[in-house]
Swiss-Prot record:
Family: Belongs to the mitochondrial carrier (TC 2.A.29) family.
One GO BP annotation of this record: adaptive thermogenesis
Lineage: Eukaryota, Metazoa, Chordata, Craniata, Vertebrata
UniProt name for this protein: Putative mitochondrial transporter UCP3
Keywords linked to the UniProt accession: Membrane, Mitochondrion, Mitochondrion inner membrane, Repeat, Transmembrane, Transmembrane helix, Transport
Solcar repeats: 11-102, 111-202, 211-296
Its job: Putative transmembrane transporter that plays a role in mitochondrial metabolism via an as yet unclear mechanism. Originally, this mitochondrial protein was thought to act as a proton transmembrane transporter from the mitochondrial intermembrane space into the matrix, causing proton leaks through the inner mitochondrial membrane, thereby uncoupling mitochondrial membrane potential generation from ATP synthesis.
GO function terms (MF aspect): oxidative phosphorylation uncoupler activity
Species in which this protein is naturally found: Sus scrofa (Pig)
Main subcellular location of this protein, as a coarse class: mitochondrion
Statement: the UniProt record of this protein carries the keyword Repeat: yes
Spans through the membrane: 11-32, 74-96, 117-133, 180-196, 214-233, 268-290
Topological domains annotated Mitochondrial matrix: 33-73, 134-179, 234-267
Quaternary structure, from the entry: Interacts with HAX1; the interaction is direct and calcium-dependent.
Gene: UCP3
Mitochondrial intermembrane side: 1-10, 97-116, 197-213, 291-308
């Protein structure tokens, strides 16, 4: 490592974990209203309260929420969302390279597509297992409809939501929907990480761009699009099942079958536009920030370790 420039120094696992969590939080701050709009569109038609809102399109959903529930409503669940990213993104993104190296055969300096997919599935599943309670609380806040600042709220705050869910639904309620969420995030993580990894690798191999902002932007945009196309059906089932009151669905499969019979197969792509807008922009902000944060953190680490 001596003599290498900061961008060339391989980042440590700690740097990757911190950088991934911080970059994901920054991306969430910028794109959270799109995620909330996606949740509202995904559950629309599921019950009378959601049906009466008549959400139409991304911008229409956000404007309806602001008009009926106040300007802060698109950011309902942000605290839980940031808690989720610090635990969730740190693992699924920060540990991806380490797990990929673990699965790569000894003596090989190149990871196959299969190895990358396995790494993406592994870190995605690990992240969901740790961060599921934060995701449940985030979805509950995003899906809750308030007529105004004085309307009855089921949860007084984020910590109250954790306590209330655990008290009323048991500790298992905090891990509600974990199986569809593991499926969804294994798929999303593969689509995001593998697509980003491959596009970036090919762009650099063919000298189309240097390892800098334009390369990171192109790779991240492609990753966001692929992730949205592949993961939307599972994402809708996950959102509905996690937000449902006890007894509405027996299990995720029952939720899926009821969606097909009551709303048709197009229900699985409800909220696709905000999903793409959100995942596309989220990936661009996150990956670009992540790459820059890794370099900045390595510079700081090298300065601290330097004897001069």
């Amino acid at each position: 490592m001596v003599g290498l420039k900061p961008p060339e120094v391989p980042p440590t696992t700690a740097v990757k974990l911190l950088g991934a969590g911080t970059a994901a939080c920054f991306a969430d701050l910028l794109t959270f209203p799109l995620d909330t709009a996606k949740v509202r569109l995904q559950i629309q038609g599921e019950n009378q309260a959601a049906r009466s809102a008549q959400y139409r399109g991304v911008l229409g959903t956000i404007l309806t929420m602001v008009r009926n529930e106040g300007p802060r409503s698109p950011y309902n669940g942000l605290v839980a969302g940031l808690q989720r990213q610090m635990s969730f993104a740190s693992i699924r993104i920060g540990l991806y390279d380490s797990v990929k190296q673990l699965y790569t055969p000894k003596g090989s300096d190149h990871s196959s597509i299969t190895t990358r997919i396995l790494a993406g599935c592994t870190t995605g599943a690990m992240a969901v297992t740790c961060a599921q309670p934060t995701d449940v609380v985030k979805v509950r806040f995003q899906a809750s409809i308030h007529a105004g600042p004085r309307s009855n709220r089921k949860y007084s705050g984020t910590m109250d939501a954790y306590r209330t869910i655990a008290r009323e639904e048991g500790v298992r309620g905090l891990w509600k929907g974990i199986l569809p969420n593991i499926t969804r995030n294994a798929i999303v993580n593969c689509a995001e990480m593998v697509t980003y990894d491959v596009i970036k690798e090919k762009v650099l191999d063919y000298h189309l761009l240097t390892d800098n902002l334009p390369c990171h932007f192109v790779s991240a945009f492609g990753a966001g699009f692929c992730a949205t196309v592949v993961a939307s059906p599972v994402d809708v089932v996950k959102t509905r099942y996690m937000n449902s009151p006890p007894g509405q669905y027996q299990n995720p499969l029952d939720c899926m079958l009821k969606m097909v019979t009551q709303e048709g197969p197009t229900a699985f792509y409800k909220g696709f536009t905000p999903s793409f807008l959100r995942l596309g922009s989220w990936n661009v902000v996150m990956f670009v920030s992540y790459e820059q944060l890794k370099r900045a953190l390595m510079k700081v680490q090298m300065l601290r370790e330097s004897p001069f």
